[in-house]
Amino acid sequence: MTFIMTSLQTPAVPEHSLDRDCTTLSRHVLQQLQSFSPEAQDLSAIMNRIALAGKLVARRLSRAGLMADVLGFTGETNVQGESVKKMDVYANDVFISVFKQSGLVCRLASEEMDKPYYIPENCPIGRYTLLYDPIDGSSNVDINLNVGSIFAIRQQKEDDLDGEGNDLLKDGREQIAAGYIVYGPSTMLVYSIGHGVHSFLLDPSLGEFILAQENIQIPDHGPVYSTNEGNFWQWDDAIRDYTRYVHRHEGYTARYSGALVGDIHRILMQGGVFLYPGTVKKPEGKLRLLYESAPLAFLVEQAGGKASNGLKPILDVVPDKLHARSPLVIGSKEDVSLVESFIQDHQHRNHG
């Protein structure tokens, strides 16, 4: 009789592979903070709730063409003056529902709501505010292209006595965490709590976000420039000159999906620059500072990139109202600096 001996010391699956497969989002947050303090557990629980919202939204999107009341518009207009899509309403309600009974946050602020949503029974417990864009790129939903959700967490430091959220009118360096969820061929959550940028893939068989990549670093330079060139003649001369520059020089490629999260994710992984400048009619631009630009700037800076309004870092810009907008130039350091140089050169020439 022949016995086949196997070593108990050699696992059939590499240990590092198992470690990664076993690293869920909530576990990773606690590892990042190297603590089981109440604050660390709160942040871990908040990220878990955001992940739950992402799973619910992803499930809805995956069946969007098969269900009633998912595609198209509601017929209403939001605080931004934009037509509201049904998926915007659903995703906004999902975030409220998953946090309403959590005891983790005392209010949520969304670009879909005029004022913050308050959870009075949680205020003595919840020490945080969640700011979010429930569905970014919602015009893509009806044609089955990628969309996303953007989020940021801020600590409650002051009383909000008038219920207007004026204590949130501070620069982006007040954020303690930020990230996004991209709903594409797979659902991916990317986040930072100030200790690097990390990505997690939703494993449908487990129903869990599993670690995909740690400590993502954006290249210092990349080939992609991402902007809506349909606005070319509405831009000022500096941005038009930059666009002509990339047209004339080899090595650049244009990519624009209509979903901010999708374009930023590409640049995070491959390098390059995303621009949403102001226009002649709207010099403040289109993107909301608190719900879109500042959270993504926090993330990109953590990955070694740069984010600017063309003149100063986005994270240093202080909003004057809850739904303030700002131009955005974000991505690889060298590419953002190049755009800034065109803007600054024009300023010097014009002010002589």
Curated annotation (Swiss-Prot):
Keywords: Calvin cycle, Carbohydrate metabolism, Cytoplasm, Hydrolase, Magnesium, Metal-binding. Its EC number is 3.1.3.11. Binds 2 magnesium ions per subunit. Its cofactor is Mg(2+). Gene3D superfamilies: 3.40.190.80, Fructose-1,6-Bisphosphatase, subunit A, domain 1. Pathway: Carbohydrate biosynthesis; Calvin cycle. Homotetramer. Belongs to the FBPase class 1 family. NCBIfam families: PRK09293.1-1. This is Fructose-1,6-bisphosphatase class 1. It comes from Crocosphaera subtropica (strain ATCC 51142 / BH68) (Cyanothece sp. (strain ATCC 51142)). The lineage of its organism: Bacteria, Bacillati, Cyanobacteriota, Cyanophyceae, Oscillatoriophycideae.
